[in-house]
Each structure stands twice: as structure tokens, then as C-alpha cells.
Swiss-Prot record:
One Pfam entry name: Ribosomal_L1
Cysteine disulfide links: none
Assembly notes: Part of the 50S ribosomal subunit.
Taxonomic source organism: Acidiphilium cryptum (strain JF-5)
GO biological process: regulation of translation; translation
Keywords linked to the UniProt accession: Repressor, Ribonucleoprotein, Ribosomal protein, RNA-binding, rRNA-binding, Translation regulation, tRNA-binding
Protein name: Large ribosomal subunit protein uL1
CDD domains named in the record: Ribosomal_L1
InterPro entries assigned to the protein according to its UniProt record, in alphabetical order: Ribosom_uL1_bac-type (IPR005878), Ribosomal_uL1 (IPR002143), Ribosomal_uL1-like (IPR023674), Ribosomal_uL1/biogenesis (IPR028364), Ribosomal_uL1_3-a/b-sand (IPR016095), Ribosomal_uL1_CS (IPR023673)
Biological role: Binds directly to 23S rRNA. The L1 stalk is quite mobile in the ribosome, and is involved in E site tRNA release. Protein L1 is also a translational repressor protein, it controls the translation of the L11 operon by binding to its mRNA.
Any coiled-coil regions, as ranges: none
Tree of life domain: Bacteria
An example molecular function term from Gene Ontology annotations: rRNA binding
NCBIfam families given in the database record: rplA_bact
Length: 230
């Protein structure tokens, strides 16, 4: 009951018909993040794309300037010296066939998956498991690489993956409600900039169509897109 009252109060503070400048929107999101844990602040963007077409997929990685406040668990498929490099760099789980067996059995104890190029024949067999979870290593995203240490460091330092869903919407966490508003806004603008740079050549019309900010337990606040690109 208390949860419902809190949500109703938060929703009443938001004008759902209004497009808020990002500074106002962020202030509302932070003031409505009153759960007993440090809520994640999320940015949602509606893009003018049709992801059903291969040439209109939007996907990428960005290291947010102020981090995310979340520590990612990193899994690495590697052998020999590269496996040792991964362990030394702070990977949470490292392996080859043994790690593949764990994944096949449903034990996935990582949020980001990195692989050296020679491991992709093995990792490729796990595509039906890793793919739907957004965990499949991809050379375009820098997660199929010989620079294992660099990839792990990037993942652990606040790197965010963004990917358009079927409806052309991107959802991404940009930090915690405890962050200063200015830092959250800086992260949001950095994410929008990365998404703009990832605009597919096949996209027609307005690319950044709608934007909204929300916290884990709070209502969505519509944002004036132009205030995210200024």
C-alpha cells in the first residue's frame, strides 16, 4: 500500500503531456526516486528507424564520463597467456570449454562477455544462449579482441552497451539516483551523442523522435530532445 501511495504521489508531480527540459526532468526523476535502495536512472529514446532492416540496426558501446555506479561482472573466453591476462585485469570468470559448458548448463555469471578471436569457433556454438541476452561477443563492439585487459578495464569503468529493440527504442542506465544531477545529465548527453553517431545510413526522417527519463521505481518523465543535444 505504501508503495502504491508513493508511486501515485510521484506520478501526480509529473505532467505527462509536457516535454521537460532535461534539467527539470532530471530534478523530477531524482526527487521521485524514494525507494529504500539507490535506484538506477534510465534514459529511453524512440528512434526513427525500422530495426527489421539489417541496415537500420543501432548498436554500440560508450564509456560514460561519470560511470554508471554499477559494477559489471565480466566473463572472458581465452586460453593460456590471454586467460592469465584476463584474470590479472579483474575478470570475474575466465575459461574455454569449461566456461562454455557452464553457459550451456544455464550458469551465466557475467553481464559482459569478451573473447579472443581464436575462441569464436567455440563461443559461436553458444549463440542461441548468449545472443538473446545481448552477451554475444562482437568485434564491432570491441568484445572480440586480443586487448583483453583494455576490454575488461572499459567494461568495469562504466561502459554501457546500447541496442535498439524491435520497436526502435533504446533503454540504457546512465547512473544512480544518488549521482549529482549534473553528472547524470552529462552521462545522458554523452549517450545521446553516441547514438547520433551510430545513426544508420538507411534511416529516414527525424532520427531522435522521443526521449524520457525514469528511475527504477519512479514514473517516466518526457524530455525535450533538443535539450539533450544542446
Amino acid at each position: 500500500m505504501a508503495k502504491n501511495k508513493r508511486l501515485a504521489k510521484a506520478q501526480s508531480a509529473v505532467d505527462r503531456a509536457k516535454l521537460y527540459p532535461v534539467v527539470e526532468a532530471m530534478a523530477l526523476v531524482k526527487s521521485n526516486a524514494t525507494a529504500k535502495f539507490d535506484e538506477t536512472v534510465e534514459l529511453s529514446l524512440n528512434l526513427g528507424i525500422d530495426p527489421r532492416h539489417a541496415d537500420q540496426m543501432v548498436r554500440g558501446l560508450i564509456s560514460l564520463p561519470n560511470g554508471t555506479g554499477k559494477t559489471l561482472r565480466v566473463g572472458v573466453f581465452a586460453r593460456g597467456p590471454k586467460a592469465e591476462e584476463a584474470k590479472a585485469a579483474g575478470a570475474d570468470v575466465v575459461g574455454a570449454e569449461d566456461l562454455a559448458e557452464l553457459v550451456q548448463n544455464g550458469t551465466i555469471e557475467f553481464d559482459r562477455c569478451i573473447a579472443t578471436p581464436d575462441m569464436m569457433a567455440l563461443v559461436g556454438r553458444l549463440g542461441k544462449i548468449l545472443g538473446p541476452r545481448g552477451l554475444m561477443p562482437n568485434p564491432k563492439l570491441g568484445t572480440v579482441t586480443m586487448d583483453v585487459k583494455g576490454a575488461i578495464t572499459a567494461a568495469k569503468s562504466g561502459q554501457v552497451e546500447f541496442r535498439a529493440e524491435k520497436a526502435g527504442i533504446i533503454h540504457a542506465g546512465i547512473g544512480k539516483a544518488s549521482f549529482e544531477a549534473e553528472k547524470l545529465i552529462e552521462n545522458a548527453k554523452a549517450l545521446v551523442d553516441a547514438i547520433q553517431k551510430a545513426k544508420p545510413t538507411g534511416a529516414k526522417g527525424t532520427y531522435l523522435q522521443k526521449a524520457a527519463l525514469s528511475s527504477t521505481m519512479g514514473p517516466g518523465v518526457r524530455v525535450d530532445v533538443s535539450s539533450l543535444t544542446a
